């Protein structure tokens, strides 16, 4: 396999599992060297052909798989030859980290700048404005809404943002 990456690294493993799942990771680990067809990958790895194709497509979308088409001169059929290239994985992980950090900061700002009310039965969590529209009654079950102190959640978000910012 043409990876140029340590698949035992827990961050890289976790990222690949989030992209292609456990079966996809198994396919990556057992994929033959060089250019191979999806059928050859399925035969060598024991992963179902549909899973192999789905995994290859996801890897291709994320620029971790390279595909070359070859036309059979006799039948006219196209054959797709695949190989993997994880040389850009560090850059991809940095982009994912920045996106996650941006989303966490947006959520933190939302949580800090709003007041929430919840149904004691767990039906809904509403913004103050939404709670006033329902006269502080749960729109699902009719229970009185109660103030929700989100300070623990805000604190957890801040810790997560700080941890990601320092890496």
Curated annotation (Swiss-Prot):
Claim: Transcription regulation is one of the keywords in the record: yes
Boundaries of every HTH TFE/IIEalpha-type domain copy: 8-90
Keyword Cytoplasm in annotation: no
Domain topic, free-text comment: The winged helix domain is involved in binding to DNA in the preinitiation complex.
HAMAP family: TFE_arch
Cited function: Transcription factor that plays a role in the activation of archaeal genes transcribed by RNA polymerase. Facilitates transcription initiation by enhancing TATA-box recognition by TATA-box-binding protein (Tbp), and transcription factor B (Tfb) and RNA polymerase recruitment. Not absolutely required for transcription in vitro, but particularly important in cases where Tbp or Tfb function is not optimal. It dynamically alters the nucleic acid-binding properties of RNA polymerases by stabilizing the initiation complex and destabilizing elongation complexes.
Record protein name field: Transcription factor E
Organism in which the protein naturally occurs: Methanosarcina acetivorans (strain ATCC 35395 / DSM 2834 / JCM 12185 / C2A)
